[in-house]
């Protein structure tokens, strides 16, 4: 090195390596309404019901810095939005109270309809029960259909190219390659069924 070792300053290093940035502005509009009340009763107590609806719109805008070299991250400008409409109902139904087989027994029900602008419509639900044979012991069980919808970046992120690396455990090396990341508006929500059981013991 004819210039010597360790003589480069930060300004020269920034010029050679390159520095890029992406300024992102996020905005969310939410309109929601809900109501709850009792629609009747069983011999164990009143039946409670809750209704809700919501509309959300997420808007994002990204402005990249210019002139960055490809290996420093070539960010692209983007401007997009994604909206969601939801409607839900929940109910709590008492089935027994002060009985010989149960100090209390309750059934909970819930359903939700969600319509995503890009991912389409999905339905989720939950059925649960809480049984207390005695006041100090409660058994709980829940069965539900759950989802995870793609987020804004996964759907609409602008193209971002740059140098990537991956570790190869067979050769113990980390080769580098040129790659590109971008959003995919055709992604669908992930779905899963969940079953849970548990108990709560509170000695008096």
Where are these regions (language model features)?
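Surface-exposed, low-complexity loop segments enriched in small/polar and acidic residues
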Residues: 1-85, 98-100, 144-189
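Sequence-level detector for tyrosine residue identity
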Residues: 15, 55, 116-118, 125, ...
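Hydrophobic, lipid-facing positions within transmembrane beta-strands of outer-membrane proteins
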Residues: 27-35, 85-93, 123-129, 137, ...
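Outer-membrane beta-barrel proteins
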Residues: 36-47, 92-100, 105-107, 115, ...
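Transmembrane beta-barrel strands of outer-membrane/channel proteins
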Residues: 49-57, 105-113, 127-129, 139-145, ...
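Active-site-proximal flexible loops/turns
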Residues: 61, 119, 193
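Solvent-exposed loop/turn segments connecting transmembrane beta-strands
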Residues: 81-84, 114-123
């Amino acid at each position: 090195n004819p210039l010597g070792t360790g003589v480069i300053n930060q300004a020269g290093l920034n010029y050679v390596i390159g520095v890029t940035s992406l300024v992102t502005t996020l905005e969310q509009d939410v309109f929601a309404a809900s109501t709850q009340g009792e629609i009747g009763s069983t011999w164990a107590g009143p039946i409670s019901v809750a209704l809700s609806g919501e509309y959300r719109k997420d808007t994002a805008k990204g402005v990249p810095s210019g002139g960055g070299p490809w290996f420093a991250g070539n960010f692209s400008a983007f401007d997009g939005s994604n909206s969601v409409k939801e409607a839900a109902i929940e109910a709590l139904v008492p089935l027994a109270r002060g009985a010989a087989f149960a100090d209390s027994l309750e059934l909970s029900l819930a359903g939700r309809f969600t319509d995503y602008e890009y991912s389409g419509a999905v339905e989720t639900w939950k059925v649960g029960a809480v049984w207390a044979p005695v006041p100090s012991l409660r058994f709980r069980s829940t069965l539900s259909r759950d989802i995870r919808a793609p987020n804004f970046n996964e759907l609409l992120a602008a193209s971002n190219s740059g140098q990537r690396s991956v570790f190869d455990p067979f050769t113990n090396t980390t080769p580098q390659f040129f790659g590109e990341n971008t959003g995919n508006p055709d992604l669908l929500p992930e779905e899963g069924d969940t079953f849970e059981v548990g108990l709560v013991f509170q000695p008096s």
